[in-house]
């Protein structure tokens, strides 16, 4: 008998995967192995097709293998994969980011969201000459030691938000607060505000599924950070250029001191960036003394993928169309569940959607998220997968909608969900 792709992988890769959430541990079973992707679809190694709502966890806002992105990457690769020297494409991508986000004057490219948030924290500590940072429970900002505390995403999925191997000396410098809890936030600033270097926040908490901010949460956070001289880092790795033309900062009219980017700015290639005012960013080496570097940072193939992905989002009506697609799917899921007597909460913001099996009327924070029935989600996940719809294999991950999800695909998805809800209790 031939080994499965997963069995083969597990011999040489820990857990058979290169990012833990892919392993299906929280939903059970073996992960599907993908051979190719196009538009709204994935195709596994056995040739089966799936409507995909993972979208590589966010970058594929224009769908998989968009012909313009593929063509641009092919052209760039013929000129060399990486130079270890400056190139004009990294300048062009930085210019696009600066043009779209008012709080950004300068950009430093790196290779992942983790690198971006890690570097932003270092820069904030240097700028303030303070050590402590504040993050929010259930928010995930990559797997660096300082930020792997009360973390969401894969850490939350595996029930180990504080990883072994992270020294207590690191953890004690990281404070946590409940997301969307203004009273708790104000108490923390009264007690610790003068010692905080930075607050880092997901403007939409997309790593404990999808939890948008309450109306006064981000404005209060901005006011408190200004009052106490704390650097506000808005982590837009997930939301940047997905939820609006200027990202979540544009959507919610909020301005960061430092912003982190990833996912959409790479178009499927490994790209991250951190950005901010010229004064702050000029503290970075080689101009200043705050060190940050990367062998493949700004490589031309990744840069052209990001440039092309962003250019496609500049089409007239792009974000209105994406928001309408997201709303259609969200309402379809609500009605499909309601028709079958199943209570769910569905949160949605342009291109992002969260489905929670909970009896609560709304989901606003990590504590609310934890009421969700993960076993029921696992059953729903496998039933949807069996019918040809691929969701992230965790109750704590966002559903991503792309421009490739046309009305026919969305209608098919809603019909499948209605069928699955009807048989979920069997």
From Swiss-Prot:
Reaction it catalyzes: (S)-4-amino-5-oxopentanoate = 5-aminolevulinate
Report the residues modified as N6-(pyridoxal phosphate)lysine.
263
| Biological process terms in GO annotation | protoporphyrinogen IX biosynthetic process
Extract the GO molecular function terms from the UniProt entry: glutamate-1-semialdehyde 2,1-aminomutase activity; pyridoxal phosphate binding; transaminase activity
Gene3D superfamilies named in the record: Aspartate Aminotransferase, domain 1, Type I PLP-dependent aspartate aminotransferase-like (Major domain)
Q: Which UniProt keywords apply?
A: Cytoplasm, Isomerase, Porphyrin biosynthesis, Pyridoxal phosphate
Cofactor requirements of the protein: pyridoxal 5'-phosphate
A GO cellular component annotation here is:
cytoplasm
List the Pfam families hit by this protein, alphabetically. Aminotran_3
According to its UniProt record, this protein's enzyme class is isomerase
Q: Does the keyword Cell wall biogenesis/degradation apply?
A: no
Isomerase among keywords: yes
Q: Could you tell me which pathway this protein works in?
A: Porphyrin-containing compound metabolism; protoporphyrin-IX biosynthesis; 5-aminolevulinate from L-glutamyl-tRNA(Glu): step 2/2
**Which EC number applies?**
5.4.3.8
Q: How does it assemble?
A: Homodimer.
Family recorded in the similarity comment? Belongs to the class-III pyridoxal-phosphate-dependent aminotransferase family. HemL subfamily.
Protein name, entry field:
Glutamate-1-semialdehyde 2,1-aminomutase
Q: Which organism is it from?
A: Dichelobacter nodosus (strain VCS1703A)
């Amino acid at each position: 008998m031939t080994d499965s792709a997963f069995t083969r992988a597990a011999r040489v890769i820990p857990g058979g995967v290169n990012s833990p959430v892919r392993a299906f541990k929280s939903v059970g079973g073996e992960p599907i192995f993908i051979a190719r992707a196009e538009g709204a679809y994935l195709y596994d190694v056995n040739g089966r097709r799936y409507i995909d709502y993972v979208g590589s966890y966010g970058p594929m806002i224009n769908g998989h293998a968009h012909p313009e992105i593929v063509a641009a990457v092919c052209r760039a690769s013929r000129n060399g994969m990486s130079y270890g020297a400056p190139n004009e494409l990294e300048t062009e991508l930085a210019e696009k980011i600066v043009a779209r986000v008012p709080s950004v004057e300068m950009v430093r490219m790196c290779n992942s969201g983790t690198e971006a948030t890690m570097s932003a924290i270092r820069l904030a500590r240097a700028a303030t000459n303070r050590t402590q940072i504040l993050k929010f429970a259930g928010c995930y900002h990559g797997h660096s030691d300082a930020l792997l505390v009360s973390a969401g995403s894969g850490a939350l999925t595996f029930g180990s938000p504080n990883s072994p191997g992270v020294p207590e000396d690191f953890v004690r410098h990281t404070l946590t607060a409940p997301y969307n809890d203004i009273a708790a936030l104000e108490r923390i600033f009264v007690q610790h505000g003068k010692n905080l270097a930075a607050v880092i926040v997901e403007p939409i908490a997309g790593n404990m599924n999808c939890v948008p901010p309450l109306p006064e949460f981000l404005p209060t956070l901005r006011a408190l950070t200004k009052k106490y001289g704390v650097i506000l880092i808005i982590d837009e790795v997930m939301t940047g250029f997905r939820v609006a033309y200027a990202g979540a900062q544009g959507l919610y009219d909020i301005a960061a001191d430092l912003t982190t980017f990833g996912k959409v700015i790479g178009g499927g290639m490994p790209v991250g960036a951190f950005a901010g005012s010229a004064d702050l960013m000029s503290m970075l080496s080689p101009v200043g003394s705050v060190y940050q570097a990367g062998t493949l940072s700004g490589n031309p193939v990744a840069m052209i993928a990001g440039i092309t992905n962003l250019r496609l989002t500049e089409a007239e009506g792009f974000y209105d169309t994406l928001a309408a697609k997201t709303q259609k799917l969200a309402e379809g899921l609500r009605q499909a569940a309601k028709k079958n007597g199943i209570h769910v909460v569905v949160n949605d913001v342009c291109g992002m959607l969260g489905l929670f099996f909970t009896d609560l009327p709304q989901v606003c924070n990590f504590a609310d998220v934890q009421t969700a029935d993960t076993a029921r989600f696992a059953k729903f996940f496998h039933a949807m997968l069996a019918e040809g719809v691929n969701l992230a294999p965790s109750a704590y991950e966002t559903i991503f909608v792309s421009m490739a999800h046309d009305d026919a695909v969305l209608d098919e998805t809603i019909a499948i969900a209605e069928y699955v809800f009807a048989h979920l209790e069997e």
